[in-house]
Amino acid sequence: GKTAFGLGSKSIHVNSIILDDSQACIDSIKNSFTIKVDNESDLYKSILNIFSDELREQGEGSYLEIQNGVGNNTLLPIPYWSWIDKKELVAQELLKNIEDKRVSFIWPLIKNEIHNCQAFLSGEYLEISPIFSLIDSFGSFSKANHRFLMSATTQDDSFFIKGLGFDVEAIKKPLVNPDLVWSGEKMILIPSLIDETLDREKIINWLLRPNDKRTFGTVCLAPSFANIKQFQRIGAIVATTETIYDCIEKLKRGEFSNSMVFANRYDGIDLPDNSCRILIIDSKPYSETLTDRYEEECRPSSDIINVKTAQRVEQGLGRSVRGEKDYSVIIITGGDLVQFLKSPLTTKYFSPQTRMQIEIGGQIVGFAKDEIDEGAEADKLFVGLINKSLQRDEGWKEYYVESMNEIDIRDRKDNLYDLISLEYKAEKLFIKGDLDKACDV
């Protein structure tokens, strides 16, 4: 809200604007519209008090958990009708906390749109965000003559339409290099499918323990800090907001004896070459915001929710392979993530490249299972598969290239874009107050 480019009519005109690494920009843009304060803040306590009756009516137990700060996984929405009725009280509380940077940077954007905002409370924090994107406030972006988004993958194509106001045809037909269908080598392995003894606990305790002879980085992407004690007990280093840069630099300097764990960091970290040759993705990613978590609870089988999850996973898969000649073994643990990758109901949400990589991994796991049936040891077979990548086995490399070259890049799911575009059109009409037309869209 304090952009140097100006807001609204005071925005500086820009001819062309480029968003590099646009999937990371999406989170930054969403955060720029969102007030998020912890349960120790005065604003949190005030909003909880103002809407205590409305929250209690939704569930006495859930309300008490939130009130006592113990319901970290519990969240409740503030009903929109109560929010609208008490919007002036909300505005007053926001102004009382205007010196808080978590409020002051957002206030200029939402101060006249309180009625079009939504709020959620958990035992940890309060989240207030607009129901509709306010990207038009940034005239330097929304009114630029040319807008370019650059990315190897996209976390949320729907946000490009509803959040950035891009035309659906531009999203359906991105500019791509037809000669670069895929890049880099990813051996995706699901050890529990080789043998049931290779479960999450065994893999985590085995591969993440310290090893002074390790000649490459071993990294784990976890969905949250919930298992931090397990990782620390093993001897892994768990990166925090304050230490994440130093942890990445240690890997790039060749300090490999301790494995690294990054919680909820599926984008924004690059671990090329030897900085990460083994990447463990542990369990399915969580929704980052209370808004997304609530939507996921209400619509667990929604196509849009599943697309977001798939693209989040794909971002994680790309952390350790950062170039055409790069390679990495990616190990999948956690029953929920394994099911998401293997179920026909959800595999379809991945890109053609990722689907092929999952298929390749499934085929070589199948070969390993056949050997187990003949009496081979599961642990040794698993290590043998990993070494085919790490030791640059020619047979493996040829098999991977031949399989990846069969990808059809035209295999792209566009069916959601038209629906999202209609939602965006209806929202724009609603904001203008044309309710009848909004309902008819």
Report residues per predicted region.
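Catalytic acidic motif of RecA-like/P-loop NTPases
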Residues: 3-4, 23-24, 266
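Short secondary-structure boundary/capping segments
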Residues: 11-12, 32-37, 162-169, 234-239, ...
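Structural recognition of the conserved hydrophobic beta-strand(s) that form the central parallel beta-sheet
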Residues: 1, 16-19, 146-151, 259-263, ...
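Inter-Walker segment of RecA-like/P-loop motor cores
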Residues: 1-10, 246-251
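Long, largely alpha-helical accessory region at the distal end of helicase-like NTP-driven motors
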Residues: 226-227, 323-441
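Conserved RecA-like P-loop NTPase helicase motor core
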Residues: 193-194, 250-340
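Conserved coupling segment at the C-terminus of the helicase ATP-binding
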Residues: 13-216, 223-231, 356-385, 395
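Beta-propeller and closely related beta-pinwheel folds
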Residues: 124-125, 192-206, 237-253, 259
